[in-house]
Amino acid sequence: MLKKVFETTNLKDSFQVEIGTYARNVDASILVRYQDTVVLTTTVFSRKPNNLDFLPLTVIYQEKLYAAGKIPGSFLRREGRSNDHEILTSRLIDRSLRPLFPDYFQQEVQVINTVLSLDPDFKSELASMLGSSLSLLISEIPFFEAISGVYVGKINDKFIINPTLQQLANSTLHLMVAGTKHNVTMIEAHANEVSEQDFLEAINFAHQYIKKLCLFQENIKQQFAPAKITNTLHQTEQTQQQAFFAKHQSQVKQAILSCNSKNDLQQLKEQILDQAKQTPFFKTIDTATVFDYEAHKKHLQTTETLFQKLSKQETRSLILQEKIRPDKRGLEEIRTLESQIDLLPRAHGSALFTRGQTQSLAAVTLGCLSESKIIDGLSDEQNKRFMLHYNFPPFSVGAVGRYTAPSRREIGHGTLAEKAISQVLPEEKDFPYTIRVVSEILESNGSSSQATVCASSLALMASGVPLKKAVAGMSVGLVFDQATNKYVILSDIQGLEDHVGDMDLKIAGTNKGITALQMDLKIQGIHFKILQEAFLQAKKGRLHILEHMSQTISQPRLEVSKYAPKVCMMQIKPEKIRDIIGSGGKIINQIIESHDGVKIDIEQDGRVFVMHSNLETVKKTVAFIESLIQEIQIGTCYQASILRFLSDKQGKMIGAVAQVCPGIEGLIHVNQKKFQKITDVLKIGETVSVKCTKINDRGRIDFLLLPKNTQEKNS
């Protein structure tokens, strides 16, 4: 393929696309330049057909540290497993692309985005999304319509397309939108209690820019005109599907309408598969008739796939035509809510939130700021003091499964809940703790990420974290008939509705506005009118859940748990930091040892955080540090400890060195008239009262020994 270069025009940002130069053994390769950000996207698909009921699409986003001129900090000094940002970006691109693939295409596809150079103000995520879409467009893969993504910020009531890092820091809205030139396909956002109307306006604003990027890609596609893979479903397979549907339609419908539709559908599927196993398959090999294992296996796979299609068709039909949900709820009805706090006595805060058959147990741990998470990627190193971890064990869905490292899904769900809560957390100066929340999903039947939001909010308030407001979340679903444009919006979708539906819109927020949002589609875009209705329906449900939560706990507790560490922050002059640390950490280690292992964190700006489980120990440590950094003054009296005696080179006694506190020492001179022999009057380790009489130009201090009954000013 000859090298071809294309560049956007009449856009805020300039994208340059190079095709035909790099990685030429793949089905499609794109090098995207976005100012100094460079991303290589490669796409490969398997020619081997699969008998699956889903698309085995894998999207990988990987950052090479040389892209930012950095050497990896790991022991091996090379990139290792994907970090959270890489995983989340991979999911972001996957969720944007997946709705655009036709149902008939089920061959394995792998799209890899490698960041080769990074300018932090020009996001590699956008370049990766453009490269992923374009590589699919110019390949044989049946991907027919371009998608693009943009970021939107909001500063001083004005929307900004693809804001810089500095602009994002001042923005009340962090919105990522992906879509085609016709519709939106994916939304991801977190915000500072932004209203539904502002969100909708921002999405519409983003889509105007998306259209231009999609047209840019389609113009490139026309120059390549790739031959696309077509539908290979044969007439015999269509006939087989029709016969299966006719035979089992009434049984499936009855199972869906039962009181326990999930279990009844599973039992019916197993019953039908058992019947399919009885079907004999034989083949002839060298005049001998033998059992055809491969044909038998394919028959079972086909039967299971057809059952899934039929149950999906019948569930959708009931919702669309008869407005009947599998569990008989109304379209806007929320499942039964239950919540309680303080389940775990030794955790610093805990809560259990149950919505129908979905249940989250959240536990809060408070720690010192030095326990915050260090994020070291392509951008500058950052400290993250709030973490929310989501665990989805196999028993939550009644299954046997492997326990491994957190999956991409678990990381994604945890991050969404983390974004929702982080908007209402107190500032570090007001609550100087590292906060970790863990959500254990004990039961799951849809919307477990939003149950996590609710449980986490309750647990944080119970732990004494002064949240600005309570946060709740809920998922809204959609069933859309593309032939008739009929649709039904469902509040608080359960697992079956999520599986057969066309949208999963998760919205979390307070009673004032939205703090986090995520939308995934299974159809090729959603009309703006439907999106508007879904937002309003989600708000109604969220307010209902917040009202329920307020009956369990309405305000954050005024104090942290008795098992949580107590912390005090003090501000000192940065030049005084060395007085606390001492040479080689000598002084700070002495403080820690003499104060029951107290934790002390010192920031470069002079903030000192003292933490211990006992409040009195914290107060004593703070008082001691204050004495360390005090400016010694002439004429002021102090308590001092005798450290040693000094003699001159001839061995003649000069005086005694007294220490007010580590780092502040002075001389009690032998010439003071009261001394006959200083060693008879003073003993090493003895505490005496002294008065500062002189500080010379070199900072050396002279003390006057006071009578024992003198009341010192400072102790």
Swiss-Prot record:
EC number of the protein: 2.7.7.8
GO biological-process terms attached to the record: mRNA catabolic process
Cofactors, names only: Mg(2+)
SUPFAM superfamilies attached to this UniProt entry: Eukaryotic type KH-domain (KH-domain type I), Nucleic acid-binding proteins, Ribonuclease PH domain 2-like, Ribosomal protein S5 domain 2-like
Main location, first listed in the record: cytoplasm
Domain KH: 565-625
Gene Ontology MF, one: 3'-5'-RNA exonuclease activity
UniProt keyword Magnesium present: yes
Residues at which Mg(2+) binds: 498, 504
GO cellular component, one term: cytosol
Protein name: Polyribonucleotide nucleotidyltransferase
Source organism (scientific name): Onion yellows phytoplasma (strain OY-M)
Protein's gene: pnp
